[in-house]
Amino acid sequence: YDKCVQILETTGLIGKANTLAGQLTLLERKRLELARAIATGPRVLLLDEIAGGLTDPEIQELIYTITSIRSENISIIWIEHIVHALMSVVERLIVINFGKKLDDGNPESVIKSPEIQEVYMGIGVK
């Protein structure tokens, strides 16, 4: 019971404990997915485009939840096309384009890379 309460608190779902999954908002369902994933006590969590379909304010709320999960000593590998969602929370950013690694490193330096700006962000494309 205590572990369930802790997971619900960590994922921001404590007030929804008795709500059916089908009655949850998209953000709440994403949080439920996270709660189910961390219930087994993983050391690593793989998130595959979890921000998809969310508005920017919802993405910020989701980031807060993911940051709470990280504070539980769970490493997170986050695959995402919405790069701005990652910038404030990742320690390392790897950009892959059609299976080829384009850059790997500190998020700020990766985003400033001319190749990344051209290929991924569409800046400077002729």
Residue locations for each model-derived region?
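Conserved catalytic motifs of ABC-family nucleotide-binding domains
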Residues: 41
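Conserved ABC nucleotide-binding domain
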Residues: 7-28
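ABC ATPase "signature
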Residues: 104-105
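Catalytic Walker B motif of ABC-type/P-loop ATPase nucleotide-binding domains
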Residues: 45-48
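H-loop/switch region of ABC-family ATPase nucleotide-binding domains
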Residues: 80-81
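A short, surface-exposed alpha-helical micro-motif characterized by mixed small hydrophobic
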Residues: 86-88
